Amino acid sequence: MSKQQKLIDEGEIAADYLEQFLDIIDFDGDIDLDVEGDRASVSIDGGDSLDMLVGRDGQVLEAIQTLTRLAVQEVSGERSRLMLDIARWRANRR
């Protein structure tokens, strides 16, 4: 399996996990997958209600990213370097 395909698979595992997470906390969001350089990138967009999932200085976002990486690692057996963005918070800080 190519490195590109592994990253795509990693993104799909993350998207499945995040979909379940959003369902549990009763939030709506559109999940987009991408590969940027040597890491999978997942973003959740869907309005101002998602700001709560970013938190102060991105602290909640970082926590969700860590949980998502652990979920990916549990399924894939490999350490994840996945990057998560919510409500374009990271994109707007670049």
Regions found by a protein language model. Name each.
Residues 1-94:
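RNA-contacting regions in translation and RNA-metabolism proteins
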